[in-house]
């Protein structure tokens, strides 16, 4: 049976064309065509290897490679006719290659299946995407370090349960996000190592009878290692799941950061101002300046969580080896990578432009008895057990609530009614500056420690 009657490369087994709706339903070219560059890269390496082992002659190799490069140019110029009836990016490129160079184009697929071809393409694509994302994480971290250095002495309230807890510096707070992003960076670097293993040569599932040189192809494509089992090579999507897991954690961090930015820009907090270019207005309320960028990042986080759940669900019931189910791996993976990359880019642009409102931050830190723990620590240094100190300060705070006075606003006589161990020097520890400066250890909020942490952060980024 001629393949012309079915319009498919695999049509020899079939006696009628695929139903038109089924062709549209099963086609993936609308979304997997973004793999074209990596598909061509893999094909060039495959053709090079086939010539090296004698399956192709040098002229055939060169003709194929020239044809593939021409096709890449057509695609990038917008002159390529993507055909749904050819199913996917692989068959579209192969069909166009055969149109251009004739029967030699049909030799390219020797020793290869679309199963190992697509697995290779996705890994090549993801490897590049991770590199871009790592660059955006670094750019965001650079912005955080710059802000933290500027704001090393800016005091704001630290919160637990969204209630005022203790004074911290704004620089210290920003560096918490730097630490989270460092872990995200490490996870993605680790994920990239496992994505960077080459399945090409696994063929459909059992390998191939041709004398292929997988080590050569591996070297040409820059993979770190060859997949060690052909069944696993074509069916493994762990790397995609692992990426989506790492992306989900990174997006969770950005979502938490977004929530703080939304709160801080509100009229109730007014801690920071976002430049107009990162905000939008209201169609009905003229006064509104909405923090749409952090809100949207917070909302998009659910998409990435969904991609992870979708891929886990996709894979959980599949027997070895390749199944058509795996066509559904690309859209969630693509979307997760796009969403994380764009969210990081938005934050990397926005964070250096944040303008903190120093006076409002400081005034907020003065509310809520934020130096209560410092008073308890003062009494401990006077020889009292911490639990007794905790209770003493609790009584003092209750008195402050009843009288409308912060601890630092009380007179010495007022404070001494709770403990005769309190002396005039107590007021040095009840100031905001005294509180933050007292926490002068690695990881603490003291300005000196913030500057030291910034220096360590700069060294870390320089080492990448």
Curated annotation (Swiss-Prot):
This is Argininosuccinate lyase. It holds the Pfam family ASL_C2. Its EC number is 4.3.2.1. PROSITE patterns: FUMARATE_LYASES (PS00163). The gene is argH. Keywords: Amino-acid biosynthesis, Arginine biosynthesis, Cytoplasm, Lyase. It comes from Pseudomonas entomophila (strain L48). It is found in: Cytoplasm. One of its GO terms (biological process) is L-arginine biosynthetic process. Pathway: Amino-acid biosynthesis; L-arginine biosynthesis; L-arginine from L-ornithine and carbamoyl phosphate: step 3/3. It catalyses: 2-(N(omega)-L-arginino)succinate = fumarate + L-arginine. Belongs to the lyase 1 family. Argininosuccinate lyase subfamily. GO terms for molecular function: argininosuccinate lyase activity.
């Amino acid at each position: 049976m001629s393949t012309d009657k079915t319009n498919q490369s695999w049509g020899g087994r079939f006696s009628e064309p695929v139903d038109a709706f089924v062709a549209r339903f099963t086609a993936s070219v609308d979304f997997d065509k973004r793999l074209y560059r990596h598909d061509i890269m893999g094909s060039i390496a495959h053709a090079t290897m086939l010539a090296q082992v004698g399956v192709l002659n040098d002229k055939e190799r060169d003709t194929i490679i020239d044809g593939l490069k021409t096709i890449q140019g057509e695609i990038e110029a917008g002159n390529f006719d993507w055909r749904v009836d050819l199913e996917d990016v692989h068959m579209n490129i192969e069909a166009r290659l055969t149109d251009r160079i004739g029967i030699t184009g049909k030799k390219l697929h020797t020793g290869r299946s679309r199963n190992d071809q697509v697995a290779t393409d996705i890994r090549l694509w993801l490897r590049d995407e991770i590199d871009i994302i790592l660059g955006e994480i670094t750019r965001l971290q650079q912005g955080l370090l710059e802000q933290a250095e500027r704001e090393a002495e800016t005091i704001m309230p630290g919160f637990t349960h969204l209630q005022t807890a203790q004074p911290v510096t704004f620089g210290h707070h920003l560096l918490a996000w730097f630490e989270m992003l460092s872990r995200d960076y490490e996870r993605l670097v680790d994920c990239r190592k496992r994505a960077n293993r080459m399945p090409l040569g696994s063929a459909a599932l059992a390998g191939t009878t041709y004398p292929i040189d997988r080590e050569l192809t591996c070297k040409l494509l820059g993979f770190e290692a060859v997949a060690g089992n052909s069944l696993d090579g074509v069916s493994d999507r762990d790397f995609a799941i692992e990426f989506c897991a790492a992306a989900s954690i990174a997006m969770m961090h950005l979502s938490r950061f977004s929530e703080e930015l939304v709160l801080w820009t509100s009229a109730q907090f007014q801690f920071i101002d976002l430049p107009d270019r990162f905000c939008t207005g209201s169609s009905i309320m003229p006064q509104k300046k909405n923090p749409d960028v952090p809100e949207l990042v917070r909302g998009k986080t659910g998409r990435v969580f969904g991609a992870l759940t979708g891929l886990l669900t996709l894979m959980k019931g599949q027997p070895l080896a390749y199944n058509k189910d795996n066509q559904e791996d690309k859209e969630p993976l693509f979307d997760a990578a796009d969403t994380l990359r764009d969210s990081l880019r938005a934050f990397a642009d926005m964070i250096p432009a944040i303008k903190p409102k120093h006076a409002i931050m400081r005034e907020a830190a003065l509310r809520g008895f934020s130096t209560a723990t410092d008073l308890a620590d003062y009494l401990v240094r006077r020889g009292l057990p911490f639990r007794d100190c905790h209770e003493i300060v609790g009584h003092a705070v209750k008195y402050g609530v009843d009288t409308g006075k912060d601890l630092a606003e009380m007179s010495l006589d007022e404070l001494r009614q709770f403990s005769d161990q309190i002396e005039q020097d107590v007021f040095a520890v009840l100031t905001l500056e005294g509180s933050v400066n007292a926490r002068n250890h690695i990881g603490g909020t003291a300005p000196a420690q913030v500057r030291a942490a910034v220096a360590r952060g700069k060294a870390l980024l320089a080492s990448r």
